[in-house]
Amino acid sequence: MCLYPRLLKNKKYTKNNKNGGKIPAVSDERTLLVPVKCGNCLECMKAKSREWQIRLQEDIRHNKNGIFITLTFSDESYYKLAEEFYGIYGYLLDNQICKLAVRRFLERWRKKYKKSIRHWLITEIGHNGTKNVHMHGILWTDKVTEIEKIWQYGYVWTGNVKNGVRENYVNERTINYITKYITKKDLVNREYKPVILTSAGIGSGYIKRLDSKRNEFKGEKTKETYTTKSGHEVSLPIYWRNKSCIRTKSTVTIIVFGCKT
């Protein structure tokens, strides 16, 4: 539960298209305001991490070609990208550099293959060596050797090579590793807030599964939970609630690069 929720006006009691401009009678004044998660406290970050864990685990059920990836920046590339931002410094600059680099990486990929590469990346500040910002995550592609050529900003880790065979895998353990950065306590970079850069529709395959039928709107009998592989019932991610047309008192949409995810 959010530690610092904000209270916003309940749109139900304002003139809108849904009510035809006729505000319904207020039976309880407490319903005039609705609590909305702050999105920044520890509890909100934990909830965000759990939702991404579920969505990513669901996604790899349907997309089998995901690889664990680490994208870095050389000093030269970092400072060259930094020159494109004026009046931005510190951690904000680090995140802006990552956004720009990923956007250009995707543009180069689309130019060569006529299609974007499915991705989920999260930023982190380094602690050794250059201490430059870098990214961990998953890229869904069979063209592993092309990643470093098209990235162009620094070293790319795509797995260890043993006896000429590249070892790389994406499973539940991998997902737990990358999503931990959402809530990771960095004692050196205490004020740093990581950014998630992602393709739209991560985990959307769940909507096509028969299991999702149990989440369709059925009034008071509507099921708003998701069953994990271990059999645990957890809260259904907001993304699926919206996709399944489940009606709740409040909804949150995550937006990355202007795209609903």
Name these PLM-found stretches:
Residues M1-K131, T141-T261:
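Right-hand nucleic-acid polymerase module
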